[in-house]
């Protein structure tokens, strides 16, 4: 259970970071890194 929860959190973080990079490269001025 705990391991599955950890993998789910890791996948969510990875997906979120990828989405941030994609949105950042789309020229959206509201998100700047």
Curated annotation (Swiss-Prot):
Top-level taxonomic group: Bacteria
Biological processes per GO annotation: cytochrome complex assembly; photosynthesis
GO molecular function: electron transporter, transferring electrons within cytochrome b6/f complex of photosystem II activity
Similarity comment: Belongs to the PetN family.
Record-linked HAMAP family: Cytb6_f_PetN
Role noted for this protein: Component of the cytochrome b6-f complex, which mediates electron transfer between photosystem II (PSII) and photosystem I (PSI), cyclic electron flow around PSI, and state transitions.
Protein known as: Cytochrome b6-f complex subunit 8
